[in-house]
Amino acid sequence: MDVPADSHIKYEDAIDYWTDVDATVDGVLGGYGEGTVVPTMDVLGSNNFLRKLKSRMLPQENNVKYAVDIGAGIGRVSKTMLHKHAAKIDLVEPVKPFIEQMHVELAELKDKGQIGQIYEVGMQDWTPDAGKYWLIWCQWCVGHLPDAELVAFLKRCIVGLQPNGTIVVKENNTPTDTDDFDETDSSVTRSDAKFRQIFEEAGLKLIASERQRGLPRELYPVRMYALKPMPN
C-alpha cells in the first residue's frame, strides 16, 4: 500500500532547511528571484486576482481591510503586493533569519503604520484572533502542513475572518492527480483535486480560481484559490 505523501512531512526538517537558506528574494523563491520573471509575474498575477474579486471582498460593519501574510518569509508578498490592497498587515513566519530580514524589508511600511503584529510561529501553531481579518493570504507555505493539519488550520482561519472575509491560497499544483513529497524542504505539492477536497472538508466555498501565468515552464503550475466560509 502506498504511503500518503503528506505522512513524510517533518516540521523540524523544514525549519532546518529554510534556516540555512539566504534571507533574500532569491533565497525564498528557490533561486527564482531577481533576474528571473518569477517575482514580477507573481505580483502581477496576485494583483489582478484581487482586483477581480474587489466587489466580492467589500468590508462590512465599518471593518478595516486588515490582512495577514501566512508563511511570510522575508515579507516579500506584503512589501510588493499586499500593502496595495490592505490597510494593515500582520505576518506569520517561524524562521528566525527571515524575521530579522523582514524588519529591514518592511521598515518603510511600518513607518506608515501598515504593519501590525509579526508572529514568530508556524502555521500549525497559529490561531488568529476571532473576526480580525479581511484577508488571510497563504502563499507557497501550506505544503509544509499534512492534510489533516491543513484542514484544522483553515478551520481556525474561518474563525479569524471578518464578516465577508476571504482566504486566498496560492500554491504549486502537481500536473497529475497525485501529490508529490519533496524531501529537500519536507513539503508536499498537492493536486488541484486534493486542494478542492481539503477546502470542502474545512467548510470553505471556492468562489474563484485562476492559474498564474507567465512562469517558467520547468516550474510546477501555480494556482490561486479564493475561499469564503460555507453558509451555515
UniProtKB/Swiss-Prot annotation:
Additional comment: Present with 3060 molecules/cell in log phase SD medium.
Protein name as it appears in the record: Alpha N-terminal protein methyltransferase 1
GO cellular component assignments: cytoplasm; cytosol
This protein's record includes keyword S-adenosyl-L-methionine: yes
Cysteine-cysteine disulfides: none
A single BP term in Gene Ontology: cytoplasmic translation
The gene coding this protein: TAE1
Residues holding S-adenosyl-L-methionine: 71, 76, 123-124, 139
Reaction(s) this enzyme catalyzes, per UniProt: N-terminal L-alanyl-L-prolyl-L-lysyl-[protein] + 3 S-adenosyl-L-methionine = N-terminal N,N,N-trimethyl-L-alanyl-L-prolyl-L-lysyl-[protein] + 3 S-adenosyl-L-homocysteine + 3 H(+); N-terminal L-seryl-L-prolyl-L-lysyl-[protein] + 3 S-adenosyl-L-methionine = N-terminal N,N,N-trimethyl-L-seryl-L-prolyl-L-lysyl-[protein] + 3 S-adenosyl-L-homocysteine + 3 H(+); N-terminal L-prolyl-L-prolyl-L-lysyl-[protein] + 2 S-adenosyl-L-methionine = N-terminal N,N-dimethyl-L-prolyl-L-prolyl-L-lysyl-[protein] + 2 S-adenosyl-L-homocysteine + 2 H(+)
Function: Alpha-N-methyltransferase that methylates the N-terminus of target proteins containing the N-terminal motif [Ala/Pro/Ser]-Pro-Lys when the initiator Met is cleaved. Specifically catalyzes mono-, di- or tri-methylation of exposed alpha-amino group of Ala or Ser residue in the [Ala/Ser]-Pro-Lys motif and mono- or di-methylation of Pro in the Pro-Pro-Lys motif. Responsible for the N-terminal methylation of the ribosomal proteins RPL12A, RPL12B, RPS25A and RPS25B.
Family statement: Belongs to the methyltransferase superfamily. NTM1 family.
Gene3D superfamilies (alphabetical): Vaccinia Virus protein VP39
Organism whose genome encodes this protein: Saccharomyces cerevisiae (strain ATCC 204508 / S288c)
